[in-house]
């Protein structure tokens, strides 16, 4: 519902009671699309998976909302979400790393930047990890890496397909080499998952960059992406300065990567659950056929 439609409904008497502009703004009734500028009724935006109905812009959502959109109701069971990051290097730049952790934990209600667990998608069981960009830019530290690795190992043991929703600025610099080690650790766990002939799908959302892109985000059997998501390793400006060339306007977008074979399919958020269910059903059918033929 647009702002114009909302006022039209008020004139028809569908909304009762006096609501001031100040109370509307304070209650957060409206959202302005950062892409097209359309003012949208917040409830309608949420009902549409936080996708702008006017231009299709995918607004950023948190990990809990992502889980709600993907999984069947009340089927998500968390795994290893008790793990909490520490400050192994006593790192301090403009602020102490320990202070940044406390601030992110208070602001998000999470212990670190990823939620992991199992769920069902249209009654099909699946392992699920969802990164949360609100927590220090979704950066991958030792706890994020450990939780994802343990989830992969659990899905291998239980013979579950795996989906990792990526939203990250890359490795967490405040943990130095410990964060970079997670790239190899997760990649090794994924190789064992693949050896067990199990399905792994990364979903690349805006943004997916740095060490996450250079490791598990690009190791899927089927690589999914949201429309217009920023996907890359180094930043655009860094690449242009290094190459001394002007890059295409759509460089490092999901569409550009699909055109060049790095992304298999782009899935609008409103179609994600049904798309996942179709893929999972097809994979389950093929596994049964292989086992029968064996």
UniProtKB/Swiss-Prot annotation:
Bound cofactor: record note: Binds 1 zinc ion per subunit.
Recorded catalytic activity of this chain's protein: N(6)-carboxybiotinyl-L-lysyl-[protein] + acetyl-CoA = N(6)-biotinyl-L-lysyl-[protein] + malonyl-CoA
Annotated pathway: Lipid metabolism; malonyl-CoA biosynthesis; malonyl-CoA from acetyl-CoA: step 1/1
GO MF terms held by the record: acetyl-CoA carboxylase activity; ATP binding; carboxyl- or carbamoyltransferase activity; zinc ion binding
Pfam family, one: Zn_ribbon_ACC
GO terms under biological process: fatty acid biosynthetic process; malonyl-CoA biosynthetic process
Required cofactor(s): Zn(2+)
Residue numbers binding Zn(2+): 33, 36, 52, 55
Keyword field: ATP-binding, Cytoplasm, Fatty acid biosynthesis, Fatty acid metabolism, Lipid biosynthesis, Lipid metabolism, Metal-binding, Nucleotide-binding, Transferase, Zinc, Zinc-finger
Record's GO cellular component terms: acetyl-CoA carboxylase complex
Positions of C4-type zinc fingers: 33-55
Subunit structure: Acetyl-CoA carboxylase is a heterohexamer composed of biotin carboxyl carrier protein (AccB), biotin carboxylase (AccC) and two subunits each of ACCase subunit alpha (AccA) and ACCase subunit beta (AccD).
Protein name: Acetyl-coenzyme A carboxylase carboxyl transferase subunit beta
Protein source organism: Prochlorococcus marinus (strain NATL2A)
């Amino acid at each position: 519902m647009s702002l114009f439609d909302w006022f039209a409904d008020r004139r028809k008497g569908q909304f009762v009671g006096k609501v001031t502009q100040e109370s509307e703004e304070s209650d957060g009734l409206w959202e302005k699309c950062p892409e097209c500028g359309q003012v949208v009724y917040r409830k309608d935006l949420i009902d549409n998976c936080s996708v702008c109905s006017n231009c299709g812009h995918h607004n950023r959502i948190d990990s809990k909302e992502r889980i709600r959109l993907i999984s069947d109701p009340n089927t998500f069971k968390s795994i290893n979400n008790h793990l909490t990051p520490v400050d192994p290097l006593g790192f301090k730049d403009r602020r102490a790393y320990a202070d940044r952790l406390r601030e992110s934990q208070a602001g998000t209600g999470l212990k670190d930047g990823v939620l992991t667990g199992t769920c069902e998608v249209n009654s099909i069981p699946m392992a699920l990890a969802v990164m949360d960009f609100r927590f220090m830019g979704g950066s991958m530290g030792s706890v994020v890496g450990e939780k994802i690795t343990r989830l992969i190992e659990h899905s291998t043991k239980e013979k579950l397909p795996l989906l990792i929703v990526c939203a990250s600025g890359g490795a967490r610099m405040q943990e130095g080499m410990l964060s970079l080690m997670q790239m190899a650790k997760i990649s090794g766990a994924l190789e064992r998952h693949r050896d067990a002939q199990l399905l792994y799908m990364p979903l690349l959302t805006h943004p997916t960059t740095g060490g996450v892109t250079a490791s598990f985000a690009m190791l899927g059997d089927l690589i999914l992406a949201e429309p217009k998501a920023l996907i890359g390793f180094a930043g655009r400006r860094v690449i242009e300065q290094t190459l001394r060339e002007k890059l295409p306007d759509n460089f490092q977008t999901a569409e550009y990567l699909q055109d060049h074979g790095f992304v298999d399919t782009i899935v609008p958020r409103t179609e994600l659950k049904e798309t996942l269910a179709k893929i999972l059903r097809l994979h389950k059918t093929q596994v049964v056929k292989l086992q029968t033929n064996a």
